[in-house]
């Protein structure tokens, strides 16, 4: 059982803090996004830190779990937090996230959905981005301003 699910048993839907990692996979100037099953919105592959993990281990695990991809290198680009990283899930769970954004490099594997967290996986260009989950929108705005997705 995940750490967050264990905590939720004790606090219900009350707001909680969570640290996690989000992984940018950029191929041919397009970014990989996933349509999330829990929110039915597009986001960036990633998830919560588990007990004993480093953030780069979280990035590697989440990338593999959600996309079946692996990367040799994970470059820490930025850490996001604050009011923009509050989220209320459809089930009522409230979360304040601290999110480490990584860029994955030297990627291998066959892109496919490997867990129940994603409904679709797709690469999008800067000018064709779908409506995004609120935290992903903040992150991608930062990514575009940095010139990482041209």
Locate the predicted segments by residue.
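Acidic, metal-coordinating catalytic segment for phosphate/diphosphate chemistry
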Residues: 1-22, 93
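Short, well-ordered beta-strand micro-motif
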Residues: 25, 101-105, 123-125
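Conserved Nudix-box catalytic region and its N-terminal flanking loop in Nudix hydrolases
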Residues: 26-66
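Nudix hydrolase/Nudix homology domain
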Residues: 40-42, 111-150
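Structural detector for helix-capping/boundary residues
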Residues: 47, 61, 74, 124-127
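A short coil-to-beta-strand element that immediately follows conserved catalytic motifs
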Residues: 70-80
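Active-site-adjacent beta-strand/loop module that shapes the phosphate/pyrophosphate-binding cleft
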Residues: 80-110
